[in-house]
Amino acid sequence: MSFAGVLADADVKAALAGCAAADSFNYKTFFKACGLAAKSHEEVKKAFFVIDQDQSGFIEEDELKLFLQTFGAGARELTAAETKAFLAAGDEDGDGMIGVDEFVTLVKA
């Protein structure tokens, strides 16, 4: 599964280029730049299941580290600091993971 048909390739490339440098990732900026923030709740949920690579129903820290790579081959991994900040922003219930509803809330924030 990919983001084809949900997000425009040009928008995804621009979003990835905007955070190519280490410690430059900002989830709000990224979600707006790639167009995900403007999508419906259902489309955001589809994106969640692409990012949830092990299909556990949650995005864990190791999947967040590889977050950018789910949007484009050759993208960098998030740094440890970026990963922890991203997890803290999305993990509303403190279980150390981001569930689908938490992800929708994060994208739409």
Curated annotation (Swiss-Prot):
GO terms for cellular component: cytoplasm. In muscle, parvalbumin is thought to be involved in relaxation after contraction. It binds two calcium ions. This is Parvalbumin beta-1. Coiled coil: none annotated. Belongs to the parvalbumin family. Residues 39-74, 78-109 form the EF-hand domain. It holds the Pfam family EF-hand_7. GO terms for molecular function: calcium ion binding. It comes from Gadus chalcogrammus (Alaska pollock). Gene3D superfamilies: EF-hand. Ca(2+) 2 binds at D91, D93, D95, M97, E102. The keyword Acetylation applies. The modification N-acetylserine is found at S2. InterPro entries: EF-hand-dom_pair, EF_Hand_1_Ca_BS, EF_hand_dom, Parvalbumin. Keywords: Acetylation, Allergen, Calcium, Metal-binding, Muscle protein, Repeat. It comes from the Eukaryota.
